[in-house]
Amino acid sequence: MKWENNGDSWKSWKVYGKLVKDHILTKHTIKKSDKENIMENHTIVTLKKGEGRTIKAGGAWIFDNEIDTITGTFKNGDVVNVHDFDGYPMGKGFINQNSKIRIRMMTRHADQDIDTEFLRMRVQNAWNYRKTTVDTSSCRVVFGEADFLPGLVIDKYEDVLVVECLALGMEQFKETIVSLLKEVLSEDGISIRGVYERSDANERKKEGLAKVKGFIGEEFDTNVEIVENGVHYMVDVVNGQKTGFFLDQKYNRLAMQRICKGKKVLDCFTHMGTFALNAGIAGASDVTGLDISEYAVQQAEANAKLNHLEDTVHFRCANVLDELPKLAAAGEKYDVVI
């Protein structure tokens, strides 16, 4: 049967999709004559009727209950082609039958190869966006699905990169992406002295992955001093929470500087004291930070000294849920509670 495309319209693609489904994937099975060709172009995953709206609207996940049939053979982590129920090609993503998130999309272009050039393009786009929008001295350079690199986070702390991988399919690309990012950064005169992996979150179990924590490449001093919003921090990328620091809270911390001058402030779950220190540097009269972790409190106190705020900003090891009723019973009052 002959099909002629008279423009890249939704209608013409729907017609094409129906031809594919009716004449190539008859009854959702592979004809022997087509098997070799389809295998070369990856497995085809067809969604149930009515599914796929999320992907068309910009989503990146396909759940197990959205899939109708899988035509072809694959292993977990392989890149597969995704079609809607009518055979319309929706793009490519990697598949993992161990996960409820069965497919994580990498591209919405069915004819796009997932190769080194593709990954470089994704990394370059991610870096270009950060250069346009944020202070890049320390920032989240790669943010998973938002950068079409699903399950992968790469944080930059000055001249150190910290990597967190939470998806099986991304494991095969992880070190290539790190190398490509170092190349992209070097083109802007940025030299990376070390890379550390913090893929130690429990979410990896859902992907059938073991936890990984350690150096990618040569070892280096993993205590990194960064400056954010005028506040200095010593970040421990090995023992700190997540990748060592909550970089995504940068502008929330900055907002504290606008409202805390001359105020009495209580910072709950202070971690490394980031919100408390932003309040202190803005001129708060008195700041108390609470955290249940002794290690976090020690880090927060060290950061207070680093910013010469130890006379104004104080930290205490306590369970916030126990401490708040005690403070209320004692009649303590605060202007700002974080």
Predicted regions and their residues:
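Intrinsic-disorder-associated, low-complexity terminal segments enriched in Asp/Asn/His/Tyr and depleted
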Residues: 5-8, 22-23, 28, 34-37
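Non-catalytic substrate-recognition/targeting regions of SAM-dependent transferases
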Residues: 142-155, 174-245, 254
